[in-house]
A protein has these predicted regions:
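Acidic, Gly/Ser/Thr-rich repeat motifs that build Ca2+-stabilized beta-propeller blades
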Residues: 1-96, 145-148, 152-160
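Beta-propeller domain segments
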Residues: 6-8, 84-201
């Protein structure tokens, strides 16, 4: 790989893994080393072969997220039960979110997305006909790691730009706008990247 944040970014087991021998994976598709390499973020299924290793010939893409730039890909993937999964997706890259994806609910960039996986296909879980039906939480820059605790609270690690590295704690199904790119942490986003003097809270 010749660019940052490339390759395999996330993996989760199919809930019926013992029978299906299937995993869900999240990765950046291979792109050229020349130019921006704005390759798509891919969600796919893959099977374990008879050798006990992943069989590349069984990869089946399920969803592709167009990445306008080469960084902020997110990609973390966890199962939460009932055949449902959370998928972290970055804002598409570059600085200051130039396309305003973090505050745009019509696409999945800058979000924690929620989907179900059944019979080899994915489906949205949310009843959302006005915006992207997969978006659960938005306003994120690059949620590359997160975890669900025993109280159904999501701990979301979001990579900051100039001043704040965020850990957001939110209820699983209580949809939240986490601020980016209007806010970075507790302060307004400014083009100059000027940070408040007291930035640890």
């Amino acid at each position: 790989r010749c660019h940052m944040e490339q390759g395999l970014l996330g993996m989760a087991f199919d809930e019926d893994f013992n029978t299906s021998r299937t995993l869900l994976i999240s990765y950046i598709e291979e792109g050229s080393c020349d130019g921006p390499n704005d390759s798509d973020l891919i969600l796919a299924s893959i099977k374990i072969g008879e050798s006990g290793l992943l069989d590349p010939s069984t990869i089946s893409p399920l969803r592709a997220i167009e990445q306008p730039y080469r960084n902020h890909n997110g990609g973390h993937l966890i199962g939460i039960g009932d055949n449902q999964y959370l998928w972290g997706i970055g804002d598409g890259g570059s600085a200051n979110d130039p396309i305003n994806n973090g505050q745009n609910n019509s696409n999945s960039l800058g979000s924690i997305s929620l989907f179900s996986y059944l019979n080899g296909e994915i489906f949205p879980v949310l009843n959302n006909t006005e915006n992207d039906p997969y978006v659960l939480h938005h306003g994120l820059r690059n949620p590359w790691r997160f975890s669900l605790d025993d109280n159904n609270m999501i701990w979301i690690g979001d990579v900051g730009q100039n001043c704040w590295e965020e850990i957001n704690l939110v209820p699983l199904f209580e949809r939240k706008n986490l601020g980016w790119s209007i806010k970075e942490g507790f302060q307004d986003v400014e083009e100059g990247g000027v940070c408040d003097e007291n930035i640890v809270q």
